[in-house]
Amino acid sequence: MKTMVAIPCMDTVQTEFADSLLKLRPKGLMMHCFMPCSLIYKSRNDLGQLAIREKTDYVLWVDSDMVFPSDTLIDLMADLEEGRDIVAATCHMRRPPFRPVFYKKLRMGITPAENEHENWDDYPKDGPFKLEAVGFGCVLMRTSVLETVINKYGDLFAPLPGFGEELSFCIRARGCGYDIWADPRVQVGHKASTIVTKETFEAFRRATEHAEGVQAGAEDHD
């Protein structure tokens, strides 16, 4: 069994990401492939083609600003071993309101203005669930999925009108008959940066005081 860890990136990667990658526990043979490119969809396309040429069995897509537990690959592989083809870890956007990159509904209209998508904030929490699209911060799939998508569409990640490359791939994969799954038990972090101001401090203090008040109220009822 051979897995390629596919990392589309620019010229640099986050230190925390590198630390996570070094600690990632393999299952079978594991190769790491960075593909620097200013066009991320092209980087993903090139990585997909490389995975096919290298005759890998699986591809773990990981963005270079992710932080993940050492058992991430093993846990997602267990989901595929139950008969799935594509499964995503739980990842959130790195800017407010920090929504999960899960899409309950995704429809491509005749024009981009008619496209539809529905975020899934209150997703199931007890085990893997099906959805229509995911972000690709951390996704494991069988390499055979890539071959099937290329054979039908000639491309993997080229953006469709009104959609980014990740959702465009999901549309193609579903068009090939694949289900897309996510596992809420596999949580990964999204490295973010922020500009800290007085408003940032005040918002954090209000949230902290509220949490402390809730905890104190709960203790009073014990």
Regions found by a protein language model. Name each.
Residues T56, E82-I86, Y178:
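Short, high-confidence coil segments that cap the C-terminus of an alpha-helix
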Residues T56-V67:
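Short beta-strand-to-loop acidic/aromatic patch adjacent to the donor-nucleotide binding site
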